[in-house]
Amino acid sequence: ATTQCFIRTAQHPIHRRYCTKQQQFRYNCLNTWFYLDTMFVSTRSVRGYTCGQVFVNDTGFSRVYPMKSKSMAGKALSDLFSDVGVPTSLHTDGAKEMTIGHWKEVREKHGGIKQTTVEPYSPWQNRAEAEIRELKKQVTRIMDNSGAPKRLWDYCLEYVSELRSRTALGLPKLNGRTPYEFVTGETPDISEWTEFSFYQPVWYYNSSEFPEPRGVLGRWLGVSHRVGQALCYWILPESAEPISRTTVQAVSSDDLVTTKVQDLIIKYDKSVSDRLARGDNDITEDECIPT
């Protein structure tokens, strides 16, 4: 199958250059709508995020971009175009950060993408509202079961969104495919998500001097897409400042029952908890309130 995104005709003598600014053709063109909304939280994340922009379509594909402020919605839209592609249409609420300013500039720069908005006080008209509820539900369950600190919600949110998009659903429209494949046309490679689960204890390589051990205890936070190459992961070390590493191994079930490793994990968890508890991490109403 083929497609044709534009056509150029020549009926008159040349008097000026053709337009060379075709920003919308730098990225994949997606044959889908995206519904979107801003997700608000009560705790500032370890990376300083206070909210997140959620994009979802009608087949269950979702993409989340944590943000330090709701005013960064335009950057999240630009990142979506770069990471996934440019959709045919957008459907939002009437918030200013999703209709004017940087948002409008990004939308017009990529071909003037059609945008519609919901009727005021009618959140049921936006699929992103239901997706946010599902994301919150799954993030809460995973963080409770794993014992992860609340300030790691942004890593868990991205992890859940990526898993949902790569899980085949029972929707007739998908015909047995994953939402990711339906939207992008590519079969998703799940290699980076099969070996570890969120906040799982792991050993990661540390280039320390002799006689310090090279394998150091940490916890797995997700895939680090913008650092290194494939199979590079976010790891939470004892310093509570996430790092990216490729050389990572799960702590084996045999090691987990030994007194030595159990003591290491207790010491690690206390150190992380103490470090993440420092400072005021609650979000004030002036920082990130919905409009």
Q: Model features per residue range: what roles?
A:
Residues 1-137, 181-291:
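Retroviral integrase
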Residues 112, 117-173:
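Surface-exposed, charged/polar loop-rich segments
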